[in-house]
């Protein structure tokens, strides 16, 4: 059973009551998920801290709660940070790389490559600075807030797709897997140490914006080289990095923690104690969402 807890913050306790018996509890992201609900669950619990530990501190309360049998993190740096803080031991933390769904991200055969260079993603200050330099020397297409089928179309149309980190922290973004799944050529800023990709075989990595600009010129002139590398990336992600592969990894670990017992999956008395905390966290997020919407409206009006 899957519950979108962000969508159902207001009635999350009711939703959990409706689930009935289950074998495992798996929480992804976990921002402002009630600790009281976790305490009420009598089955093995797992947490996927899918954002960088260094910049998403709202995960701290879950990571140091001691309530999870095992935790999955975004990078090796995240794993080291958690262990150094004494929150978890090494055997309780696993790096879980991102992946993709082949039904959502795929090559479009015969599509015209009419976009020279594409950046697709959220526009933050660091990226804006890089792109302002890049667009002086090439035809750059910027796509912000584009997802789903529209994203797949753009990525397939591009000769070169750029990957630029949102901050100074090195990362291996989900977008990498999605672009390679479209069999598109990827030119990326240097990736984090846990990247499964080989520079020059699956994609091309650069050290700085100047090298990215010079690499754009080189690879725009060589469709054969772009095709060779994009084929390598496509084969790599299809073989190793689909969400099905990730699910198989999770299942193998979940089953190692399997417990039999006559107790209920959720302790109703403990769950009742979580009502007040759940209401507070719902109201907190409702007010924050209202504030963000108001701020966006004001900025849009005076832009």
How would you name each of these model-derived features?
Residues 1-22, 27-40, 44, 49-199, ...:
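Nucleotide-sugar donor-binding catalytic core of glycosyltransferases
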Residues 67, 175, 215, 232-233:
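Short, hydrophobic/aromatic alpha-helical segments in well-folded domains
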Residues 123-124, 208-209, 243:
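Short beta->alpha junction loops/turns
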Residues 167, 200, 234, 238:
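Conserved short-loop catalytic and cofactor-binding motifs
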Residues 203-209, 218-223:
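Conserved acidic donor-binding segment of nucleotide-sugar-dependent glycosyltransferases
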Residues 216, 221-303:
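C-terminal amphipathic helix plus adjacent low-complexity
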């Amino acid at each position: 059973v899957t519950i979108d807890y962000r969508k159902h913050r207001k009635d999350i306790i009711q939703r959990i009551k409706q689930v009935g018996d289950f074998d495992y509890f798996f929480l992804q992201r976990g921002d402002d998920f009630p600790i009281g609900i976790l305490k009420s669950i009598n089955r093995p619990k797992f947490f996927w801290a899918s954002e960088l530990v260094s910049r998403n501190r709202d995960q701290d309360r879950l990571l140091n709660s001691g309530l999870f049998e095992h935790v999955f993190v975004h990078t090796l740096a995240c794993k080291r940070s958690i262990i150094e803080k004494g929150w978890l031991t090494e055997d309780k933390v696993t790096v879980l790389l991102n992946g993709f769904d082949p039904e959502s991200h795929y090559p479009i055969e015969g599509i015209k490559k009419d976009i020279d260079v594409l950046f697709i993603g959220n526009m933050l200050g660091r990226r804006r600075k890089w792109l302002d330099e890049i667009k002086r020397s090439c035809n750059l297409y910027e796509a912000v807030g584009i997802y789903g089928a529209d994203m797949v179309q753009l990525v397939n149309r591009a000769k070169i797709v750029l990957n630029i980190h949102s901050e100074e922290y090195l990362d291996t973004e989900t977008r990498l897997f999605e672009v390679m799944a479209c069999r598109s050529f990827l030119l990326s800023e240097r990736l984090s140490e846990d990247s499964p990709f080989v520079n020059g075989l699956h994609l091309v990595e650069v050290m700085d914006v100047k090298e990215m600009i010079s690499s754009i010129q080189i690879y725009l002139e060589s469709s054969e080289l772009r095709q060779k590398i994009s084929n390598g990336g496509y084969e790599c992600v299809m073989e190793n990095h689909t969400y099905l592969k990730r699910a198989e990894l999770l299942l193998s670990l979940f089953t190692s923690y399997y417990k039999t017992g006559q107790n209920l999956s959720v302790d109703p008395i403990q769950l009742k104690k979580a009502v007040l905390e759940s209401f507070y966290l719902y109201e907190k997020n409702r007010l924050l969402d209202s504030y963000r919407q108001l701020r966006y409206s004001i900025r849009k009006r005076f832009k």
